[in-house]
């Protein structure tokens, strides 16, 4: 009987690990899907529901020192998780496979690909009620959030060596009328 319980526990633990992308190439978690289809990085796993205690966690490998773009799509009708519709906690764990050290890291939201999100489009890093307790990094000591003319979150005062895996946590609010938006990830490298 104990052996059966151990096997059941192991199977349950495996079911909590993201098994891979769906047939459409997207990774599903919470009310959204996530895609590395624009290149420069690849997703290893996506888990979580998007709540504060169970954030959506994206494990990825960044192969470039140039900005890369994560495609985020509403995957199903928005559920209520104790915060406004279209809001979720996100944790991004990124392996630095660029071959260069990073001295800062920036995230930018875009409702239209290539055009920074503005104050009025309904997409933000929680601009209506910013809470610094919801923003974190294990490699950078401080962050700056900018809501005008764009929605950017820059992490600074730290560094990430090649093959290191920094983690970033933040809250995204999405009350846009569109079902697809973008998260640009921009590692900053030292220059001489």
Describe each model-derived feature in a short phrase.
Residues 3, 18-21:
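N-terminal leader/targeting segments
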Residues 92-94:
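Buried hydrophobic-core signal for structured, non-transmembrane domains
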Residues 130-131:
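Long, charge-dense
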């Amino acid at each position: 009987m104990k052996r059966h319980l151990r096997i059941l526990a192991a199977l349950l633990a495996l079911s909590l690990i993201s098994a891979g992308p769906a047939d459409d190439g997207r990774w599903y978690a919470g009310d959204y899907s996530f895609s590395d289809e624009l290149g420069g990085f690849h997703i290893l796993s996506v888990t979580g529901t998007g709540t504060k205690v169970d954030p959506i966690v994206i494990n990825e490998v960044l192969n470039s020192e140039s900005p890369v773009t994560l495609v985020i799509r509403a995957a199903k009708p928005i559920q209520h998780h104790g915060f406004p519709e279209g809001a979720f906690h996100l944790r991004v764990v990124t392996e630095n496979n660029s071959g260069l050290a990073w001295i800062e890291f920036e995230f930018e939201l875009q409702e239209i690909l290539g055009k920074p999100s503005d104050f009025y489009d309904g997409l933000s890093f929680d601009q209506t009620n910013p809470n610094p307790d919801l923003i974190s990094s294990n490699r950078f000591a401080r962050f700056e959030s900018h809501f005008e003319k764009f929605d950017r979150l820059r992490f600074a005062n730290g560094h990430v060596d090649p093959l290191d895996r920094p983690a970033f946590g933040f809250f995204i609010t999405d009350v846009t009328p569109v079902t697809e938006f973008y998260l640009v990830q921009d590692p900053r490298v030292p220059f001489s």
